[in-house]
């Protein structure tokens, strides 16, 4: 043991260094030889331990900071760091990249020994190589893969030798075979490989007994590891003991340039570097083929997924187009159906919806629903046939559908309620009966066709006839009613003309009322038009009561009869010159008061004047004779004789 080794061990004990630190100190010592590979392998294995990794790296950085005569510490630390980067944990390379400036500063390391030799050049070159390796990522990966493969082989060598009780010499990574050591060295190490088959002299060939080297490689292993079924150089392999030919070990060593660690599975291992390269290329090709197959499968899946997405997208685009194309035939079909509907003739194409000669099948311009067809006014007038049919059960339009007759006073329709005010006070149908006949018989109603009813085949001709007979019916009705006391509305000439036509589809009041027709006085529902002299307030509501007192329509032109006091005080009777002289009213009053006999006669005379009053008034109203003269000629007053 050298002095430096003793001093190092003393420092380890005093400073209480750990096992990892002790190994790093030994690998980076100041001895004139380099660090052993076995020691560096142990340190590399310790880098996978977190605690040991920190201890190893701290000691390595401490060694890199030395200078001067301790240049070997720096150089060996760089060598150890290079080995740890390639075979140790990946954290070593990561930490070296983080502290790469500490390695770059070593490119300027200077030291010249006593002999004038520049020893710092070794440190400078090693630091440059290490910095270049750390900066080149691809090169670092390749170097690391190669170093890990070599380390695995070294581990297999140690395992194979340990199974055959073969140990390495202290301080050397080479096996203690006879190629480099004497037989005494095997005894110190624990025996020779051939100790299990007899003496080494009998098991080895003469060439081996002389200590000739088996090969040039340091990794040469015994043949028993490669061929376990054949005893290594035993007598069984040489039954006759003929050693003239070289043994199998010598022949194998002569042909093999790079022997491998052997076992039962070593039969498949390559024997040469060419076979190794061939197997490596074959493995790479197989791996590439598997990767390409996986890539093809993945691309096929992606392609099928893309095709499915495109198909789904096309389907979603086609569906709205089909809907749009499908809606066009429906619209054209509806248009064809509308065109195929029968038209109502030339009258249906008129632009004016309010024309008097409306078509038979005219539609409602307001879009309202059509009412039941073939319905008529249940209260027809005695003038003409209705020009349009009206629904009696529809919306009550008595206040709004009071149209004005053609060629007449616009306020004539509102004058009729005043002429029959007495009858409307007790008749609930008065408002309808006084307005509808005039509106229907002698005028065109603006909204008569809005109820949706359908006319008969002769309605167009009826409109033409009613327009001609409107003036005659309006002018003839007052003259007929004034000439007769009780005219029959159903025996008038216009009604006879209208009844001569086929009206099987029309309804009559009797058919509308049915068996209850006898309960309704139809004469009271038809009234005579009011004389034009009378007028009403045009702003009065149609349903409001009349302002004038109820008047008997049959006694409109009859004045009130004169009483006895009026007859006595009237100067007309006394001053009449048409019928001769006679006593005055005063003489008649005196005679009636003084004589008792003439009182019954006067009473009879007075009673006879009362019933004659209406006839005389009627005669006055029709002929125009003054009432005073009519009374003088129509009575036999004894006082006037």
From Swiss-Prot:
GO biological process, one term: negative regulation of sprouting angiogenesis
Annotated region described as Disordered, given as residue ranges: 163-214, 255-275, 340-425, 470-512
Location in the cell: Cytoplasm; Cytoplasmic vesicle, Clathrin-coated vesicle
Xref: Pfam families: ENTH
Keyword Cytoplasm: yes
PTM note: Ubiquitinated.
UniProt modified residues of type Phosphothreonine: 508
Chain residue ranges for the region called 3 X 3 AA repeats of N-P-F: 537-639
Domain ENTH residues, every copy: 12-144
GO cellular component, one term: plasma membrane
Domain of life, per lineage: Eukaryota
Cross-referenced PROSITE patterns: ENTH, UIM
Sequence repeat start-end pairs: 352-354, 364-366, 377-379, 391-393, 409-411, 427-429, 537-539, 552-554, 637-639
Phosphoserine, modified sites: 173, 192, 195, 486, 570
Subunit structure: Binds EPS15. Interacts with ITSN1. Binds AP-2 and clathrin. Interacts with UBQLN2.
Purpose: Plays a role in the formation of clathrin-coated invaginations and endocytosis.
Domains: entry comment: The NPF repeat domain is involved in EPS15 binding.
Assigned protein family: Belongs to the epsin family.
Protein name stated in the entry: Epsin-2
Organism the protein comes from: Homo sapiens (Human)
């Amino acid at each position: 043991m050298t002095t430096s080794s003793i001093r190092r061990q003393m420092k380890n004990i005093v400073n209480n260094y750990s096992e990892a630190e002790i190994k790093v100190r030994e690998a980076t010592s100041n001895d004139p030889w380099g660090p052993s590979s076995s020691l560096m392998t142990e340190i590399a294995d310790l880098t996978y331990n977190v605690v040991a990794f920190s201890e190893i790296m701290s000691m390595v950085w401490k060694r890199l900071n030395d200078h001067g005569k301790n240049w070997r510490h720096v150089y060996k630390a760089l060598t150890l760091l290079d080995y740890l980067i390639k075979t140790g944990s990946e954290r070593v390379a990561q930490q070296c990249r983080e502290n790469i400036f500490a390695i770059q500063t070593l490119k300027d390391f200077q030291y010249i020994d006593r002999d004038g030799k520049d020893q710092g050049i070794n440190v400078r070159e090693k630091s440059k190589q290490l910095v270049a390796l750390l900066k080149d990522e691809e090169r670092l990966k390749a170097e690391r893969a190669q170093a890990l493969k070599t380390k695995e082989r070294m581990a297999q060598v140690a395992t194979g030798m340990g199974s055959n009780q073969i140990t390495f010499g202290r301080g050397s990574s080479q096996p203690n075979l006879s190629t480099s050591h004497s037989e005494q060295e095997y005894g110190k190490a624990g025996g020779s490989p051939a100790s299990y088959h007899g003496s080494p002299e009998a098991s080895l060939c003469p060439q081996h007994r002389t200590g000739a080297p088996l090969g040039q490689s340091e990794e040469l292993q015994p043949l028993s590891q490669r061929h376990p079924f054949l005893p290594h150089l035993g007598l069984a392999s040489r039954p006759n003991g003929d050693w003239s030919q070289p043994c199998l070990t010598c022949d194998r060593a002569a042909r093999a340039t790079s022997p491998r660690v052997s076992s039962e599975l070593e039969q498949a291992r390559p024997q040469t570097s060419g076979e190794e390269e061939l197997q490596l290329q074959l493995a790479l090709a197989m791996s590439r083929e598997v990767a390409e197959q996986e890539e093809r499968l993945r691309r096929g899946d992606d392609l099928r997924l893309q095709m499915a997405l495109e198909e789904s997208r096309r389907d979603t685009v086609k569906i709205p187009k089909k809907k749009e194309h499908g809606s066009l035939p429906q619209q054209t079909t509806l248009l064809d159906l509308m065109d195929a509907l029968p038209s109502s003739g030339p009258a249906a194409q008129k632009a004016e919806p309010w024309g008097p000669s409306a078509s038979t099948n005219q539609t409602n311009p307001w879009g309202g629903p059509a009412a039941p067809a073939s319905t008529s006014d249940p209260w027809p007038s005695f003038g003409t046939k209705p020009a349009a049919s009206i629904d009696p059960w529809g919306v009550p339009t008595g206040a709004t559908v009071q149209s004005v007759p053609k060629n007449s006073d616009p306020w004539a329709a509102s004058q009729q309620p005043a002429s029959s005010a007495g009858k409307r006070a007790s008749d609930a149908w008065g408002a309808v009966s006084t307005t509808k006949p005039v509106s229907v018989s002698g005028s065109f109603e603006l909204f008569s066709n809005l109820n949706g009813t359908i006319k008969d085949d002769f309605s167009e001709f009826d409109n033409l006839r009613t327009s001609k007979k409107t003036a005659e019916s309006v002018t003839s009705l007052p003259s007929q009613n004034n000439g007769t006391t009780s005219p029959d509305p159903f025996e008038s000439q216009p009604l006879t003309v209208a009844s001569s036509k086929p009206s099987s589809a029309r309804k009559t009041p009797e058919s509308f009322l049915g068996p209850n027709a006898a309960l309704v006085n139809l004469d009271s529902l038809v009234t005579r038009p009011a004389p034009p002299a009378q007028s009403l307030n045009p702003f009065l509501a149609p349903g409001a009561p009349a302002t004038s007192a109820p008047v008997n329509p049959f006694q409109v032109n009859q004045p009130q009869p004169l009483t006895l006091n009026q007859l006595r005080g009237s100067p007309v009777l006394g001053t009449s010159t048409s019928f001769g002289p006679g006593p005055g009213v005063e003489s008649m009053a005196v005679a009636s008061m003084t004589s008792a006999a003439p009182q019954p006669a006067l009473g009879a005379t007075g009673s006879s004047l009362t019933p004659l009053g209406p006839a005389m008034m009627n005669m006055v109203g029709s002929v125009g004779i003054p009432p005073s003269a009519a009374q003088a000629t129509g009575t036999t007053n004894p006082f006037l004789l």
